[in-house]
């Protein structure tokens, strides 16, 4: 069954948990087949697209192009149009309503839609408008989400020239912010960076590369040249001194980031620029960091660095401070340094791990972890603490 704009409006009115999914589905929905053949002279959206991308049309003055586009869209959207627009092409109405509604619910839905919706006609009409409005109002989270979507896009339905313009405009905004208000640049840039995902083609980005590598000057008017992976992005990042003012934007970025390279940037900058300040790290913040809903080797490594960097955090106090379970959790880390730290902690401070925990860890393929488990199991009473069932499970595993 095909979704309609009316279905979306009803879902919004009832605060349906699936509202975002409905919007994404409608944006990707194929246009319905007309009941009767279309007249060759009839105005259609596809004809409109064919015209605006034709060389002859693009050769006309900009003002003439704009006037023609506005008039044709008016005719296509008219109630008496011979061929009504497909429902997906009307999605801009819903997205703009989400933007004008200032409730927290609408804001949450809008940001999720921006993150997931395909960059196609219909939604794009609203997103472009919101981009400009967010820029004018200095709405960093909204502008950052839209800018990152444009920077990550590979093949949008609209013209690549439009996409490149939006990328350049977004970086120009950040650059001017860094030049005129450097104190707020890291906060704004953090919201931009937080919106990138792990499937980003980093070598093809424009905004992210400027944030990371602006001082390499290895860029032209529309794209960067090759940046070696060995390049120190902390030395070549834009507005380096602004980032070094306070750790707060980087700490927030670490909790917001959706991509591992962004987390690494934040952690590396914190280690390099704020090692002294972080010697007095708040225990609760460290606990909150460990409980972020993401598996990250970068964060695991950073947690170990924080524990080792702070003289007030002694391993004997970890249970009392609430850090014991965090370090035990690092036994499952994919980061070798974090895993090694956790293994040594267990040997020194936690040889009393429950048998159920040891049996669960025994399923992990890591050789160093298997050695630890064997060592701890050998210290337990084979009948009273382990039992036949546990021995049966262990003997079925290759490392035991």
Where in the sequence are the language-model features?
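Extended amphipathic alpha-helical repeat scaffolds
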Residues: 1-243, 254-263, 269-276, 290-297, ...
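Amphipathic alpha-helical scaffolding segments comprising HEAT/armadillo-like alpha-solenoid repeats
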Residues: 186-190, 244-253, 276-288, 312-329, ...
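Short leucine-rich amphipathic alpha-helices used at interfaces
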Residues: 233-234, 239-241, 316, 341, ...
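Hydrophobic core positions within HEAT/HEAT-like alpha-solenoid repeats
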Residues: 266-267, 300-304, 342-343, 373-374
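Amphipathic alpha-helical scaffolding segments
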Residues: 268-273, 284-285, 347-349, 364
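Structural signature of alpha-helical solenoid repeat scaffolds
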Residues: 271, 304-308, 347, 378
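Amphipathic alpha-helical segments within extended alpha-helical solenoids and repeat-rich scaffolds
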Residues: 326-327, 398-400
